[in-house]
Amino acid sequence: MKVRASIKSLKNQPGAQVVRRRGRVYVINKLNPRFEGLQG
């Protein structure tokens, strides 16, 4: 999981879900976990 300034490219990957937890925006990808990230 990487911290990214912009998660737009991560959320466009197949299998990506955008989730808000504790005020932070995460991208979770079960199909391809390489494309997981946190907006920060």
Curated annotation (Swiss-Prot):
Name the chain's protein: Large ribosomal subunit protein bL36B
Record keywords: Ribonucleoprotein, Ribosomal protein
Family statement drawn from the similarity comment of this UniProt entry: Belongs to the bacterial ribosomal protein bL36 family.
State the gene name recorded for this protein. Answer: rpmJ2
- One example GO MF annotation: structural constituent of ribosome
Under the heading InterPro entries, the entry gives: Ribosomal_bL36 (IPR000473), Ribosomal_bL36_sp (IPR035977), Ribosomal_L36_bact (IPR047621)
Indicate the segments annotated as coiled coil, or none if absent: none
Q: What domain of life does the UniProt record list for this protein's source? A: Bacteria
Which biological process, per GO, is one annotated for this protein? translation
